[in-house]
Amino acid sequence: MIIKNLQEFYRLLIPNAPLIAIDYGSKKLGIALSNQELSIAMPLNTITEINTKIVITVLLNIIEKYKVCGVIIGLPIDMSGAVTEQTNIVMKFAEELAKSINLPIYLQDERLTTKAANNLLKSFGVKRKDRNNNDDAVAASMILETVLDSIKNI
């Protein structure tokens, strides 16, 4: 189920279970995982497959393996806050994922996270090819970190 309010999302979480975050791009998906205490976000994986059924199968395996209690999906909106074509694609994906899992899903504004992730990796001296292979997972961890920081204030 897609939850629009962060407090409601937090209320539905199972204690001592991690969250995953997804940075859904047009060519690949970045995935990040929190610790059980919901205090740390870590890049986990990048999926280069964009077929929704395959992606959902991979996500179901991750959810089962790590005993995840909720999902955060980065919602791409433009700088003015307007909905874009990519926003609609991500919303459709979120709705498909919601049909496949019985976990709360929260959509988090993700403006500029992939660019910030790429810049962060660049500042560490990571080569362009490696940055492009990992920037979505790092962006997912930034999206997750934003939510974890907000949860601390609830």
From Swiss-Prot:
It comes from the Bacteria. SUPFAM superfamilies: Ribonuclease H-like. HAMAP family: Nuclease_YqgF. Belongs to the YqgF nuclease family. Its EC number is 3.1.-.-. This is Putative pre-16S rRNA nuclease. It holds the Pfam family RuvX. It is found in: Cytoplasm. GO terms for biological process: rRNA 5'-end processing. GO terms for cellular component: cytosol. It is an enzyme of class 3 (hydrolase). It comes from Rickettsia rickettsii (strain Sheila Smith). Keywords: Cytoplasm, Hydrolase, Nuclease, Ribosome biogenesis. SMART domains: YqgFc (SM00732). GO terms for molecular function: nuclease activity. PANTHER family: POLYNUCLEOTIDYL TRANSFERASE, RIBONUCLEASE H-LIKE SUPERFAMILY PROTEIN. Could be a nuclease involved in processing of the 5'-end of pre-16S rRNA.
